Structures are given as structure tokens and as C-alpha cells.
């Protein structure tokens, strides 16, 4: 009986007040990682940000924090949490750095500035993507007949839209299944469905 005890959001949750409250009432811990604007209330001279009642809310746009770069995408915010956990728990950095491919895709597709940390995420992610071992990504590119170098265009106009196509299909879970699947036949079946 593996019970879920923690929910970590990625790129959402900053306005999910009711949903976070329900999860907390059900006994779950909730960490919100998001980059979207935070709701504010203005009581006189001071503006106050209104946050969901999660165990932690990680958002570079929080005014009570002094994180130097506020234009991270949702995937990058979640990646930063993972990096902190990997450091604390002595995690496998090769695995963590392998996720830069997804952070690069998220950075381009979330249409944030390609400056500061975002620029580094995209450069490093593209280096890895051009030699990727991720079968789901390879299958999408193959099914899209993409045979050139993977660049920002590939992220923004081939990979990103293909992954987002799941919203138009019966279930958005198809993209996640594609990225996690290990059976090569199933991977290509899912890629064909998306492309």
C-alpha cells in the first residue's frame, strides 16, 4: 500500500487556493512550484501577495524573497527545487543534469526571456538534446521527420507543440507516458498519436 503523502506542483498552483486547501484537509503535504504572477491585495500603502496555504510555495516572483532572477519558467522553478534536494540528499547529479533537456524545452515553450539563467538552461539543454538518449524525444523527432540539429526552433515549433498536443487528445497523460515508457514499440505508437 504505497500511499501518497506529498504533492509537488510544477508550473501551477499559485492560484489553486481551494485545491491546495482540499489536499491539506486530506492530510497531504503540498509544495507549490510556479512562476506565474501572484495575486495581491492592497491594504493602504502596502501590497501583500496572497499565497495558497501549502507547506511551501516556491515562486521567484514572491516579494518576500530576494531571488535575483524572476523570469524563470515553471520547469526551471521545479528544477531548482530538485537541485536543492539533490544537494541536500547527495543525489545523482548525472540524472539531474539529464533533466536539463526538459528545462530547455520548458524555457522556450513557456516564452520567458532567454537571458540570465534561462540562457544557460537552454544552451546546456540543447547540448544534451543533440545527443539525447531519451527515446520519447527521439521518437517524436523521427515521427516529425526532423533530421537537423536540435535548436530553439525545434523546441518551440516541433517538440513543444507535439507535447502540448495531448491537450487536444483524449488525455494529457499521453505525453507523460511517452517520456516514461521503456517499451520501444509503445513509444513509437504514442509518438505517432501525438504527431
Task: Map each language-model feature to its residues.
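A short, charged helix-loop
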Residues: 38, 52-66, 77-86
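N-terminal small/polar loop signature for handling phosphorylated ligands or for N-terminal nucleophile
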Residues: 1-50, 58
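Short, well-ordered alpha-helical packing segments
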Residues: 20-24, 79-82, 126
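Alpha-helix capping and helix-loop boundary segments enriched in small/acidic/polar residues
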Residues: 7-14, 39, 65-73, 96, ...
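Hydrophobic helix-and-loop "lid/oligomerization" segment in the mid-to-C-terminal part
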Residues: 1-6, 25-27, 45, 53, ...
